[in-house]
């Protein structure tokens, strides 16, 4: 009986052992949690696309084509010298015909094509129309020529190469007062575009501070820009020797042609960057005699870098570059300087925009439009020059001429 009981106990013990081993063998062990994969750095090198929008056709095509051509020359020079930080640059420039809605569409095409940095728009309305989208997309804007004060507002990653309108208007009054030019003046401006209105308002405010007397103010609109007889007669009646014309070159050409022979031969016509291109627009260059424009660029500046650009432009495009071409050229070199300062080596850098914005506030660019730095609100700090047209040629103005 005892032997039987021992045998039963042994059998039960074996059965329990087998059951335990079976249960352990059937248990599914959870695999060890995998460490999250570290984010791989973006591959170095590649092509970094710079996009731009501007009028390549239409009334203001001279501005858009000049910016595009100047920018392309800079891109070609940089790539020929080995690129920047192992990357090559490409330029994709879309035609807006000067229309803000078309500019928005063109900006969208550039984003779809892989744009990483933007030249914004050539005109102020174009740039203002895409600034919000660029902020949302995380794309830095450096517009060569959008000068309206509000063109880059609302986006901390928006900068410009040109002077803002209010700065140009103020500087114009300062230049007239400080360089022995007539201080009894007339003003002729376009009252339905921001560029002209902004320049006039700033000029008027500074003129009062600088002892400049505005004898008459004459205006026109887009719908009345073909006949300036009334305005010219009023200017003549005022007896002034200087007319401030903060307008674009196309309207200026019409005005100067109609004013020829009606205003005194020695009358000075003083404008800003919008007059750049007047010699290519006006039918008779003699009608542009004594036209002055405040600009940061002068094609006859003997500076070696300026003359190198003028030569390259003449070889590749033909003719003499205007300020807009120079602005486009400087914008690309500013991008290059910021890329180098930020240490960006790949177009796919996930922090490209943030790095570029920080770098823009630290770089100094020895541009052909003057040595430039930028403020936190995107405004350039650089000197201005004045040009005067004599015998169909624009040249640097020297006080006392």
Where are these regions (language model features)?
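Beta-alpha junction/loop-to-helix N-cap segments that form part of ligand/metal-binding clefts
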Residues: 62-69, 81-152, 161, 220-228, ...
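Segments of small-molecule ligand-sensing domains
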Residues: 315-325, 336-394
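Extracellular/periplasmic bilobed ligand-binding domains
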Residues: 200-294
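Short, low-complexity disordered leader/linker segments with a strong preference
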Residues: 1-49, 80, 112, 136, ...
